[in-house]
């Protein structure tokens, strides 16, 4: 009998050792379709006395896509005297094949937590990413059109150290530091050039890291009301020659990554929200400021707003989002007709607490000058399971 009890205790030890580890994640995928429309207006010239307007559109492209599936592990250990060790490891996965090849490519860290707050090091989400959970709850493989990808281009999970304060009567704050060697490198994208009537391929050239990057945040929550302020500063921005390509095309565009880095890049975002019963409202405003690397230190700026509203009717949650970017200022001059507008509408239907059908449609119009624009129409239907 004693031998059986001993064996039972020994077999339970490994389970006790990992009892504080949680496995979680989301598997979500579906069918997406989208098409592009554009208009180009050419002013009169000697060879062309009339205004020339060219319109074009692509066919509808449909494919099965992963909508951002991931898996995560997290846990903690009591170190005594109110101190805990905390850790987390998250990884992108794809049910449509492909996906990330390195572990910990999502928020992954190790740290300490106690009455003083929480200190973490690793790939840690910044304050902008935290705030976007309320303003952009959409699931899609197309983050530029079917999510508020332009508005939330500063969301990131940089390799950094972050401190979060404890709650003081509803207020809390955070500071975050990204060392220069961990900041994203600017680079010249691969491209073709014409030499002696021959197309010559020029490979991508990776440059030096941009600079140290600093983040700060302030949060407030009282009942159904919540608000946050997010701040970013980089002495040398690493987005490349033209930050406004990020504004227009999104951070993954090669056109956004040239060789003329910006200086004194700072971003400010205010987000407010209200939740009551089945109603959820969120509103955000964002200001992006920078200087050019030229001797004149000319100024750039973009101003944007976004709003999201949803209401639960039984198992269904209809939702709508709107974002607007005002005409930008580049090198001290206002860009005429350089705004953008975006609308996303859809509904989630919960089959259970963990499994939902997700349906959405999106429209994005980017004005790229007087008489010029690019428009993206997108729609998706899929399934999401949380565990």
UniProtKB/Swiss-Prot annotation:
GO CC field: cell outer membrane; pore complex
Signal peptide feature range: 1-19
Topology in membrane: Multi-pass membrane protein
GO MF annotation terms: porin activity
Pfam families given in the database record: Porin_1
UniProt cross-references to InterPro entries, sorted A to Z: Gram-neg_bact_OMP, Gram_neg_porin_domain, Porin_dom_sf, Porin_Gram-ve, Porin_Gram-ve_CS, Porin_Neis
Subcellular localization: Cell outer membrane
Transmembrane segment boundaries: none
Source organism superkingdom: Bacteria
Protein keywords: Cell outer membrane, Ion transport, Membrane, Porin, Signal, Transmembrane, Transmembrane beta strand, Transport
Biological processes, Gene Ontology terms: monoatomic ion transmembrane transport
Described function: Serves as a slightly cation selective porin. Major antigen on the gonococcal cell surface and it may have pathogenic properties in addition to its porin activity.
Subunit relationships: Homotrimer.
Family: Belongs to the Gram-negative porin family.
Identification of the protein by name: Major outer membrane protein P.IA
Protein's organism: Neisseria meningitidis serogroup C
């Amino acid at each position: 009998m004693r031998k059986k009890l001993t064996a039972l205790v020994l077999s339970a030890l490994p389970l006790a050792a990992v009892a504080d580890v949680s496995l979680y994640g989301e598997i979500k995928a579906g069918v997406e379709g989208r098409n592009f429309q554009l208009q180009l207006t050419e002013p009169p010239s000697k060879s062309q006395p009339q205004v020339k307007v060219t319109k074009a559109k692509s066919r509808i492209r449909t494919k099965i896509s992963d909508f951002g599936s991931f898996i995560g592990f997290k846990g903690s250990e009591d170190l005594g005297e109110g101190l805990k060790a905390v850790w987390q490891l998250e990884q992108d996965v794809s049910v449509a094949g492909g996906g990330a090849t390195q572990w910990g490519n999502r928020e992954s860290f190790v740290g300490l937590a106690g009455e003083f707050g929480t200190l973490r090091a690793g790939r840690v989400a910044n304050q902008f990413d935290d705030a976007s959970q309320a303003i952009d709850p959409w699931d899609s493989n197309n983050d530029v059109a079917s999510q508020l990808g332009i508005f939330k281009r500063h969301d990131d999970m940089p390799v950094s150290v972050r401190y979060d304060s404890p709650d003081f009567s509803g207020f809390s704050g955070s500071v975050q530091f990204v060392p220069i060697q961990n900041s994203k490198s600017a680079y010249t994208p691969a491209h073709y050039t014409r030499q002696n009537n021959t197309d010559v391929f020029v490979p991508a050239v990776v440059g030096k890291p941009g600079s140290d990057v600093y983040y700060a945040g302030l949060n407030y929550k009282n009942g159904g009301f919540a608000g946050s302020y997010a701040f970013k500063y980089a002495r040398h921005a690493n987005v490349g020659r033209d930050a406004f390509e990020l504004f227009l095309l999104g951070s993954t565009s090669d056109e956004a990554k040239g060789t003329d880095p910006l200086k004194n890049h700072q971003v400010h975002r205010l987000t407010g929200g209200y939740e009551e019963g089945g109603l959820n409202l969120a509103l955000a405003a964002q200001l992006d400021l920078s200087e050019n690397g030229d001797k004149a230190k000319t100024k750039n700026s973009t101003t944007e707003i976004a709003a999201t509203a949803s209401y639960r009717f039984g198992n269904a949650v209809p939702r709508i989002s709107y974002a607007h970017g005002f005409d930008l200022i580049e090198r001290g001059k206002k860009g005429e007709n350089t705004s953008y507008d975006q609308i996303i509408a859809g509904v989630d239907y919960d089959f259970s607490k963990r499994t939902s059908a997700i349906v959405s449609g999106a429209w994005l119009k980017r004005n790229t000058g007087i008489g010029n624009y690019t428009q993206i129409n997108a729609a998706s239907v899929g399934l999401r399971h949380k565990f």
